[in-house]
Amino acid sequence: RERMVVPEGERFVCVAGTQPMDAAVPEARRKAEPGTIIETCPGAAATVYEVAGRLNEQGGAALFIDYGHDTVRDGSTLQAVRDHLKVDPFVNPGEADLTAHVDFATLATIAQSRGCKWLGTVPQGRWLRNLGIDARAQTLAQAAPQHAQAIEAAKERLVGEGQMGLLFKVMGLACPGWPGGAGF
């Protein structure tokens, strides 16, 4: 069943919907125990399906970068962020950004079902390091020593395990016959 958000008194709460959502659940997850929360994003699935088809027809490669997981997981990742802090998504609606983690494993399966080459899904920090972010940051810092601390801080935000380096993932797709992607 779909989870719905409904008003309850002065706040909002999640409740089970009345309509089955079997068509939206990825095939690999249809045998989950009743009551298991399985997040799906039909919009992301449709986008990857379309991009994979275009890559096969027109050639090329695509990168998808966002926070999420590269293995199938159950449970809710819904969160609200206001002023860089996590807040209750059901309090003061409209005053926070709502978000959920990307299910890269399902998106990779969709792309491969269209004949697309999956280059991999790796943590952003590893991908950037494989592409040479450390050397680039060092070169920038040497060229502008007055900005060396800011450059190092910006690099650490992108690659640090406690920052964006592990939470954010990079998924690469390419047309068949395309060489392996750099960074993967």
For the regions a language model picked out, list residue spans one by one:
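Long, Lys/Arg- and hydrophobic-enriched amphipathic alpha-helices
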Residues: 24-184
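Intrinsically disordered, low-complexity linker/terminal regions across diverse proteins
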Residues: 1-37
